[in-house]
From Swiss-Prot:
Cytoplasmic domain ranges by topology: 72-81, 141-162, 233-266, 326-428
Modified positions (Phosphothreonine) in chain numbering: T357
GO molecular function annotation: G protein-coupled receptor activity; neuropeptide binding; signaling receptor binding; somatostatin receptor activity
Keyword field contains NADP: no
Membrane-topology annotation of the record: Multi-pass membrane protein
Record localization: Cell membrane
GO biological process terms on file: cellular response to estradiol stimulus; cellular response to glucocorticoid stimulus; cerebellum development; forebrain development; negative regulation of growth hormone secretion; neuropeptide signaling pathway; response to starvation; spermatogenesis
SMART domains: 7TM_GPCR_Srsx
Protein name: Somatostatin receptor type 3
Length: 428
């Protein structure tokens, strides 16, 4: 059986000598010797294509909604908003490979030509790795925000996040260079896949290990480590807050800490579980197929199809995790989706805004705290610039220090020294 590499690289005919990126499901669909009627294969291909198109539509709508909320309803984007924007963009572009995958399943051949094959596979791979790398970067950012909030404040800014996001896209493009070089539609075949030089088995195995390490196991290790340290930090902080002095003096703070611990724990479980659930079968099937070729029996079609669809389903679920679990995105979605009904309710007597939950209040409090930290950071930077201006000049004159807040600080005029007065009188 040929190796499984990218969700979109799914040839529908089997070439045991050189085909390298074939999905078992789609390869079997193109192989009439599997013992299944051609009519049954055609129906299966059409049904699978319809499922892919549904996943594509849902993913495009969800990620487009996230992108619109970030760009339209975020006046001053935070670090998390920048990463969510890039994640949604990568997931949305990742969805664009599904129509080509659906067409190849329905037609049992690639109708778009060799150049389009190479372009689709390259773009699909870039956005696949960008999506995974964005999840990893967001996990590192959450670790810095929770475990090292003070030391990381100067680095956790929107401009730095944009530069990191640009580096993620460049790194993803570099990682998929082998796809650009070796993908295409070989002569005598009608499918889009990767064709390795001899020895093809060694190249194929090396590429499977390469993509699995960079595309799953490496990011998973970083994500698990970050969230493990976050949980340890939150629990240690909660134990300090649960002290008797805190229970009597800072009861509201204790409650907020407990709610924050529960919220972070739920987010950790959701992120890690979804990531592992959607991507581990994909890469495990790759590795198993290298060690022991997978059977081409119709009984395994459902398993192969599920493994192909799960990575795309992860991109559909990301807007739910990173959008709907955030109060800020909830409000943005409500403004977009419930605008007509909200106008009707606003005309009804006694109607008011919905009551906020404890998590929403905690998130608003956290956003206010982050905004206050950003203002304090800007004030400290202003103080630093003013202190540099107030340093002694080349003539050795010392300027008086300023007092007041950062926004009110201005340099006071210097009093002339005795030498200056004498020099001035000599010129009169």
């Amino acid at each position: 059986m040929a190796a499984v590499t990218y969700p979109s690289s799914v040839p529908t005919t089997l070439d045991p000598g050189n085909a390298s990126s074939a999905w078992p499901l789609d390869t079997s669909l193109g192989n009439a010797s599997a013992g299944t009627s051609l009519a049954g294969l055609a129906v299966s291909g059409i049904l699978i294509s319809l499922v892919y198109l549904v996943v594509c539509v849902v993913g495009l709508l969800g990620n487009s909604l996230v992108i619109y909320v970030v760009l339209r309803h975020t006046s001053s984007p935070s670090v998390t908003s920048v990463y969510i924007l890039n994640l949604a963009l990568a997931d949305e572009l990742f969805m664009l490979g599904l129509p080509f995958l659906a067409a190849q399943n329905a037609l049992s051949y690639w109708p778009f030509g060799s150049l389009m094959c190479r372009l689709v596979m390259a773009v699909d791979g870039i956005n696949q790795f960008t999506s995974i790398f964005c999840l990893t970067v967001m996990s590192v950012d959450r670790y810095l925000a929770v475990v090292h909030p003070t030391r990381s404040a100067r680095w956790r800014t929107a401009p730095v996040a944009r530069m990191v996001s640009a580096a993620v896209w460049v790194a993803s493009a570099v990682v998929v260079l082998p796809v650009v070089v070796f993908s295409g539609v070989p002569r005598g075949m009608s499918t889009c896949h990767m064709q390795w030089p001899e020895p093809a088995a060694a190249w194929r195995t090396a590429f499977i290990i390469y993509t699995a390490a960079l595309g799953f196991f490496g990011p998973l290790l970083v994500i698990c480590l970050c969230y493990l340290l976050i949980v340890v930090k939150v629990r240690s902080t909660t134990r300090r807050v649960r002290a008797p002095s805190c229970q009597w003096v800072q009861a509201p703070a204790c409650q907020r800490r407990r709610r924050s611990e529960r919220r972070v724990t739920r987010m950790v479980v959701a992120v890690v579980a979804l990531f592992v659930l959607c991507w581990m079968p994909f890469y495990l099937l790759n590795i198993v197929n290298v060690v022991c070729p997978l059977p081409e029996e119709p009984a395994f079609f459902g398993l192969y199809f599920l493994v192909v669809a799960l990575p795309y389903a992860n991109s559909c679920a990301n807007p739910i995790l990173y959008g709907f679990l955030s109060y800020r995105f909830k409000q943005g979605f409500r403004r977009i989706l419930l605008r007509p009904s909200r106008r009707v309710r606003s005309q009804e007597p006694g109607s008011g805004p919905p009551e906020k939950t404890e998590e929403e209040e905690d998130e608003e409090e956290e956003e206010r705290r982050e905004e206050e930290e950003r203002r304090m950071q800007r004030g400290q930077e202003m103080n630093g610039r003013l202190s540099q201006i107030a340093q002694p000049g080349p003539s050795g004159q010392q300027q008086r220090p300023c007092t007041g807040t950062a926004k009110e600080q201005q340099l006071l005029p210097q009093e002339a020294t005795a030498g200056d007065k004498a020099s001035t009188l000599s010129h009169l």
